[in-house]
């Protein structure tokens, strides 16, 4: 299985993740995918051909193997890693959409040169607003997928130790036959390692959800105690808000009113018509 494409996609998300999220990604790729690709696939590579039962009855080996190993450990872990990594793509799509809006605003303001557009693509997006919800939802889904696969693994293979010998009496076996599993010790070691890595990822996901909620509450408390000034506020999200647009309209009206009063001061003999218009504008 080629994991390069998945790694490329998730590396982009890593730039906008929290510190705990970056640790989670390291655990995913170093302790799980690398071990799965380099070692585990070779250990389980001959599991079907080396599963031998002490009978010559045609079909008995295949039926017994399917009974005790309904899905290969390697394929189950591969499916788990793909589904666990998929929610992170929600964050990547949200960040791409947000950067697209920022580029659009730059073009509307006359700053659509390649240098500014590249700067938008490179800068780190803060986890706030709707992106905060997207990020939290993705972490929760990661947590649910990890827990669901741990439960499925427990249902399929109770215990973590790989047995050396199994007894099978499924049809078409003529009687109860003994079947031998290849490399049971190696498979037990890798099973324990992968389950431990999955448990670490669950702990990291829980810690990241708690961290995100705590940081959002702290930010909200800080905003209530120190409301942000309008002068220092920037960013494209603020420029798109209705409050910003209304403030700009009021500013233009006040500037127009001030310039009209200036004209009246400089030429006092222009008549009462302009004064009336000025008063009318002020009343508006």
Swiss-Prot record:
Pfam families: Connexin (PF00029)
Lipid bilayer topology: Multi-pass membrane protein
Chief location: membrane
Cellular component terms per the entry's GO annotation: connexin complex; cytoplasm; plasma membrane
Subcellular localization, as worded in the UniProt entry: Cell membrane; Cell junction, Gap junction
GO molecular function terms listed in the Swiss-Prot or TrEMBL record: gap junction channel activity; identical protein binding
UniProt keyword Ribonucleoprotein, yes or no: no
Function: One gap junction consists of a cluster of closely packed pairs of transmembrane channels, the connexons, through which materials of low MW diffuse from one cell to a neighboring cell.
Name listed for the protein in its UniProt record: Gap junction beta-1 protein
Organism annotation: Bos taurus
Lineage of the species this protein comes from: Eukaryota, Metazoa, Chordata, Craniata, Vertebrata
Gene it is expressed from: GJB1
């Amino acid at each position: 299985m080629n994991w390069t494409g998945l790694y490329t996609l998730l590396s982009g998300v890593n730039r906008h993740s929290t510190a705990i999220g970056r640790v989670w990604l390291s655990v995913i790729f170093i302790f799980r995918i690398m071990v799965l690709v380099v070692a585990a696939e070779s250990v389980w590579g001959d599991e079907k051909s080396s599963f031998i039962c002490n009978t010559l009855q045609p079909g008995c080996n295949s039926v017994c193997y399917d009974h005790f190993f309904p899905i290969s450990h390697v394929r189950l872990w591969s499916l788990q890693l793909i589904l666990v990594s998929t929610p992170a793509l929600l964050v990547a799509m949200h960040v791409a959409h947000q950067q697209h809006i920022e580029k659009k605003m730059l073009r509307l303001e006359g700053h659509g040169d390649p240098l500014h557009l590249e700067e938008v693509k490179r800068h780190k997006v803060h986890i706030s607003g709707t992106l905060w919800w997207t990020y939290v939802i993705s972490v929760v889904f990661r947590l649910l997928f990890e827990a669901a696969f741990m439960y499925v693994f427990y249902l399929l293979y109770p215990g973590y130790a790989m047995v050396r010998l199994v007894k099978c009496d499924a049809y078409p076996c003529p009687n109860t036959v003994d079947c031998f599993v290849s490399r049971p010790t190696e498979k037990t070691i890798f099973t324990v390692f992968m389950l431990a890595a999955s448990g670490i990822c669950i702990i990291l996901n829980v810690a990241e959800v708690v961290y995100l909620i705590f940081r959002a509450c702290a930010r909200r408390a800080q905003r209530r105690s120190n409301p942000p000034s309008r002068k220092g506020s920037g960013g494209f999200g603020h420029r798109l808000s209705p409050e910003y647009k209304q403030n700009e309209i009021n500013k233009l009206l006040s500037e127009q009113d001030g310039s009209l009063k200036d004209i009246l001061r400089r030429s006092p003999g222009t008549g009462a018509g302009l004064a009336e218009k000025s008063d009318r504008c002020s009343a508006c």
